[in-house]
Amino acid sequence: MSSEPPPPPLQPPTHQTSVGLLDTPRTRDRSPSPLRGNVVPSPLPTRRTRTFSATVRASQGPVYKGVCKCFCRSKGHGFITPADGGPDIFLHISDVEGEYVPVEGDEVTYKMCSIPPKNEKLQAVEVVITHLAPGTKHETWSGHVISN
């Protein structure tokens, strides 16, 4: 054992070191996103993480109709506007049935499931596109583009 005192704790520098990269505020140019107005749940609830009991409850529930408000394939989620009004419903990519990627204006049917942990908000599950939006290009999950 040594009788030397422990070294003093490291202190942050008292002067500002500047590299030049952080001196200027950075702004990001972004295209407007229709997803910005909606709140995406965190963590994202997916079919894979849903409990069996929640899946059973949703499957036994009523079928609703709505229109796809927006869907971003790269982000893996979007929103549905219910046909009977009310707030937009969150949609995760894992809950889309069928061969087409939803686009704005597609008519859909869906069931609803509450989003944990508080179960205050709802998400669409078992989503089926019933009518493709006219005048739009639709993509299959495998990447083929079909003009409508």
Swiss-Prot record:
<feature type="modified residue" description="Phosphothreonine">
    <location>
        <position position="46"/>
    </location>
</feature>
<feature type="modified residue" description="Phosphoserine">
    <location>
        <position position="53"/>
    </location>
</feature>
<comment type="function">
    <text>Binds mRNA and regulates the stability of target mRNA.</text>
</comment>
<keyword id="KW-0694">RNA-binding</keyword>
<dbReference type="GO" id="GO:0043186">
    <property type="term" value="C:P granule"/>
</dbReference>
<feature type="modified residue" description="N-acetylserine">
    <location>
        <position position="2"/>
    </location>
</feature>
<dbReference type="InterPro" id="IPR019844">
    <property type="entry name" value="CSD_CS"/>
</dbReference>
<keyword id="KW-0963">Cytoplasm</keyword>
<feature type="modified residue" description="Phosphoserine">
    <location>
        <position position="31"/>
    </location>
</feature>
<keyword id="KW-0597">Phosphoprotein</keyword>
<dbReference type="InterPro" id="IPR012340">
    <property type="entry name" value="NA-bd_OB-fold"/>
</dbReference>
<feature type="modified residue" description="Phosphoserine">
    <location>
        <position position="147"/>
    </location>
</feature>
<dbReference type="InterPro" id="IPR011129">
    <property type="entry name" value="CSD"/>
</dbReference>
<dbReference type="InterPro" id="IPR002059">
    <property type="entry name" value="CSP_DNA-bd"/>
</dbReference>
<protein>
    <recommendedName>
        <fullName>Calcium-regulated heat stable protein 1</fullName>
    </recommendedName>
</protein>
<dbReference type="GO" id="GO:0043488">
    <property type="term" value="P:regulation of mRNA stability"/>
</dbReference>
<feature type="modified residue" description="Phosphoserine">
    <location>
        <position position="42"/>
    </location>
</feature>
<feature type="modified residue" description="Phosphoserine">
    <location>
        <position position="33"/>
    </location>
</feature>
<feature type="domain" description="CSD">
    <location>
        <begin position="63"/>
        <end position="130"/>
    </location>
</feature>
<feature type="region of interest" description="Disordered">
    <location>
        <begin position="1"/>
        <end position="47"/>
    </location>
</feature>
<feature type="compositionally biased region" description="Pro residues">
    <location>
        <begin position="1"/>
        <end position="12"/>
    </location>
</feature>
<dbReference type="GO" id="GO:0003730">
    <property type="term" value="F:mRNA 3'-UTR binding"/>
</dbReference>
<comment type="subunit">
    <text>Homodimer. Interacts with STYX.</text>
</comment>
<dbReference type="GO" id="GO:0000932">
    <property type="term" value="C:P-body"/>
</dbReference>
<dbReference type="InterPro" id="IPR052069">
    <property type="entry name" value="Ca-reg_mRNA-binding_domain"/>
</dbReference>
<feature type="modified residue" description="Phosphoserine">
    <location>
        <position position="59"/>
    </location>
</feature>
<keyword id="KW-0007">Acetylation</keyword>
<dbReference type="GO" id="GO:0005829">
    <property type="term" value="C:cytosol"/>
</dbReference>
<dbReference type="Pfam" id="PF00313">
    <property type="entry name" value="CSD"/>
</dbReference>
